[in-house]
């Protein structure tokens, strides 16, 4: 009887969703170590090297430390909104993984509107930032939340436009169909005809994740941590996990839509059921670029951030949509 229940679609979806959340939390923990190691490499340091061999157990030590820290809520805070905000930030980052295909038949939910689902879920992240700023009842938190909301909503526009070209080329909104469209070798990857769109998507992804040079909602040197200033312990850890999970999911989506997803760069490198390794390699490389930018570029001013989004990325993506449409008509 238990096996019959597990074969039913709701149970399968719930188990798959729980597995995805567990994996996302572990990915976020590993990325904290990767972030420290990359920053140490860039700054000619060793990085964490005390806990476990070569510091590999540092994430476990961090989790234990954060578990035993007290979760302090400000006296004036709207408690339920304050505590719900980290969850509202983390769940969208985890939910996107449900539609990312890791290999042939390896997807939790193969939606025929996968791109629309991605747009809808990522836009919810701004709500969590607003909840954190409003629920904290702190001027710095509120200012950071307003910055974050303006930034994330502004960069949703070029983010969506950058993926319309992909949908036009493939004729589908399903991520599985888009990956299968890129089969046959790296010369069939969508990044080549859609290079400006890929760059626009990547820059918009940086802004959506709120990473340097787009970390104005946090801005430690300006607004003392922004919307995160009143959080501590595991609530603070969940916000950090949502940031790292968002970075990983943006890299995975970029790899899926522009770099062939699970498709190998050359046909003879096909690994069959282990093709998910190719998606992992591509995603890891893009995560490294995220971290490289984080530790080498300064923060932009608010006016520079808005100018980049509205005056450069939006016109470029609209122009390339017309170029793509014209090329499809001619060819």
Swiss-Prot record:
Paired cysteines (S-S): none
Principal subcellular localization: membrane
Keyword terms of this UniProt record: Cell membrane, Membrane, NAD, Quinone, Translocase, Transmembrane, Transmembrane helix, Ubiquinone
Membrane topology designation: Multi-pass membrane protein
Annotated GO CC locations: plasma membrane
E.C. no: 7.1.1.-
Localization: Cell membrane
Transmembrane segments annotated in the record for this chain: 13-33, 80-100, 113-133, 159-179, 183-203, 249-269, 273-293, 311-331
Quaternary context: NDH-1 is composed of 14 different subunits. Subunits NuoA, H, J, K, L, M, N constitute the membrane sector of the complex.
NCBIfam families in alphabetical order: PRK06076.1-2 (NF004741)
Family to which the UniProt record says this protein belongs: Belongs to the complex I subunit 1 family.
Protein name in the entry: NADH-quinone oxidoreductase subunit H
Organism ancestry: Bacteria, Bacillati, Actinomycetota, Rubrobacteria, Rubrobacterales
Gene name as annotated: nuoH
């Amino acid at each position: 009887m238990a096996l019959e229940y597990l074969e039913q679609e709701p149970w399968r979806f719930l188990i798959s969703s729980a597995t995805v959340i567990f994996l996302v939390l572990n990915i976020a923990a590993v990325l904290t170590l990767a972030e420290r190691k990359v920053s140490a490499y860039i700054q000619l340091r060793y990085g964490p090297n005390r806990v476990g061999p070569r510091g590999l157990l540092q994430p476990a030590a961090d989790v234990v430390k954060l578990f035993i820290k007290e979760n302090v809520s400000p006296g004036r805070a709207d408690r339920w909104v304050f505590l719900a905000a980290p969850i509202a930030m983390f769940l969208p980052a985890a939910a996107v993984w449900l539609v990312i295909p890791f290999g042939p038949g390896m997807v939790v939910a193969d939606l025929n509107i996968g791109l629309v689902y991605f747009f809808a879920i990522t836009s919810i992240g701004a709500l969590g930032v607003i909840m954190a700023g409003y629920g904290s009842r702190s001027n710095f938190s509120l200012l950071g939340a307003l910055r974050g909301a303006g930034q994330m909503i502004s960069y949703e526009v070029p983010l969506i436009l950058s993926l319309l070209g992909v949908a036009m080329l493939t004729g589908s909104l399903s991520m599985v169909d888009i990956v299968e469209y890129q089969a046959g070798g790296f010369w069939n990857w969508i990044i080549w005809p859609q290079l400006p769109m890929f760059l626009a998507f990547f820059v918009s992804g940086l802004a959506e994740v709120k990473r340097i040079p787009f970390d104005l909602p946090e801005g430690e040197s300006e607004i003392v941590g922004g919307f995160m200033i009143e959080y501590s312990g595991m609530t603070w850890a969940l916000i950090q996990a949502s940031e790292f999970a968002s970075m990983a999911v943006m890299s995975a989506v970029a790899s899926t839509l522009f770099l062939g997803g699970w498709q190998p760069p050359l046909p003879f490198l096909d690994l069959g059921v282990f093709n998910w390794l190719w998606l992992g390699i591509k995603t890891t490389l893009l995560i490294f670029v995220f971290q490289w930018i984080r530790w080498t570029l300064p923060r932009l001013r608010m006016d520079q951030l808005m100018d980049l989004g509205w005056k450069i990325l939006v016109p470029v993506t609209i122009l390339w949509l017309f170029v793509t449409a014209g090329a499809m008509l001619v060819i």
